[in-house]
Amino acid sequence: MFKPSFTNLTPHSIWVTIHPDFLDDRGIEYPASGQVARVAANRAEGPLCGPHRMVQQSFGAVEGLPEPVEGTVYIVSALVLSALAGSRPDVVAPDTGPDAIRENGQIKAVRGFVC
């Protein structure tokens, strides 16, 4: 069985639980590597919306993502994964959908990854 190495390119630890119902010690923690993959954001002053200032934002290239390394899977944010549009099969994002484990509204663990 192929066992890849995971490198977390987000700014925070990712906990993937193994147990289907709750967070316990049977999960795997992927600590932040210290390197962060991001999507460049371009911002421009937009029109006013009533009394509120608006900013027009568009996204550009992915930054901080290493070249593929055989046997390595990179964990990135959903925004980075979306910007890659399927071009990198070695890149995944935490599955933060409705099955993620939350505490006080904050995600504490995910059950897997989105590819």
Language-model segments: residues:
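Intrinsically disordered, low-complexity segments enriched in small/polar residues
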Residues: M1-C115
